[in-house]
UniProtKB/Swiss-Prot annotation:
Protein name: Gasdermin-C4
Family of the protein in this entry: Belongs to the gasdermin family.
Domain of life: Eukaryota
One GO cellular component term noted in the UniProt record for this chain: cytosol
Reported modifications of this chain: Cleavage by CASP8 relieves autoinhibition by releasing the N-terminal moiety (Gasdermin-C4, N-terminal) that initiates pyroptosis. Palmitoylated.
Amino acid sequence: MGYSFDRASKDVVKKLQGRDLRPVECLSDATKFRLFHILQETPRSGWETEDIPVGFTLLDLLEPNFPVPEPEVSAPKPFIHVQSTDLEANLNVADIARGGVGYVGYGGYNIEVQSTSIPNPKLEILQNRKLLDKLPTFMKFCRMERKNLYVVTEAYEVSKDTMLTGLSSVNLLVKGFFKQLFKVRGKAGRSEKYSIPIPKGSVLAYKKQQLVIENNTCVILPSATKKKMTFPDRPLKLYDLPVTLRYQEEVIETGSWIDDIDPIGTIEEPANLNFMCLQHEVSEQTQLLAELSKDVQEVVFSSFLHMLSDRDVLYDLMKMLELNQLGHMDGPGGKILDELRKDSSTPHDVLKDLNLYLLQALLVLSDTQLCLLAQSVKMGLLPHQVELVKSILQTNFKYSSNTPFTLQPQLLAPLQGEGLAITYELLEECGLKMELNNPRSTWDLEAKMPLSALYGSLSFLQQLQKANSSSKPSLSPGYI
């Protein structure tokens, strides 16, 4: 597996074991999470929240000529990690051919990071400071949209230039029909080498504290817990909640989950409540997607296919939509923005929210998974993958401990050869231990969020592909 920037950031966060420490997921924004930078929190539906840097610091918003606290800087800490994956199997492929399938990957890093922080006592200098009379336009938008804002108070920066390296390869030993399909003798497949430079000063992880703005003054709360809204004069209403939370409120209010409670000791909460919410949300959003015109769905489908291999482009598009900035953007992302600017029968907010939903789900996934999704679309694997991931979540969502489970044979049957190798690697990247010769695995609580995002991504892409089934997707080599 290639070691991408977001994977390295998440790994460093685990090793630091800091409370409320969050990873930076996109290298292009790694300098926008430094001390005092302001972040807009955005829910990622059923999986998590995303912090979007707005391009301003707290110091840009406060009246000038005030003292600025001196940050505390730690000594550099080294982090070294090497990881490899090797999956091999001999499988029957629908009585057509016999061959070997394998996935081989390795990746790693050697990074030094140091923290810069402003402890709460030093933040007292900035408490209750007056804001500028004329604030940036994003502040008005955040107030109208009831968005919460945060300030970075601790950042872990790379102390010297470094490099992430790795390789991922899917190989298929082909015979019979597959020999003609791939037009080769022996092995067929794909491999990709990774080499990503990480410049000095890039932020891998950060801590944030919430801002409360009232009476033209700014208060920094002691933590990021949302005890108050950033703009208290704009109270949060039920219809402002994400779909998952609204549905959960309805389920709890009606008590429809009561009969589904399992015996004490197997779960931490009403059985399947969260999965019911997730399933309802994905179904509701997918239905809205299906109601778009075929032309609009074709634009969205082709645009996302060409963006799947480029996390930075996906992230930039998400930022523009989150901050309601519909300006110029090159490439396939620009086509989606063009659709949003059109005066069409599709409501602007509906189309924007649906694109955001898919973007937020995709950005939970690793770079390897994004490339594998593009290949899954091309091979027509999505319907089978949706059902497989759904069955894993439905069975294990309620468990907080490591629990063995077995993949259902009827769901694995359509996934043979390279399709099975791709699907297993998608699951492996979520945190499940998979072996191609073995349908058994063990549930890991940390896999819940990426699996949920994978379920949402697969469901959306399946609907888009279904709407575009009359024309086969054409992916240029640069996008796979």
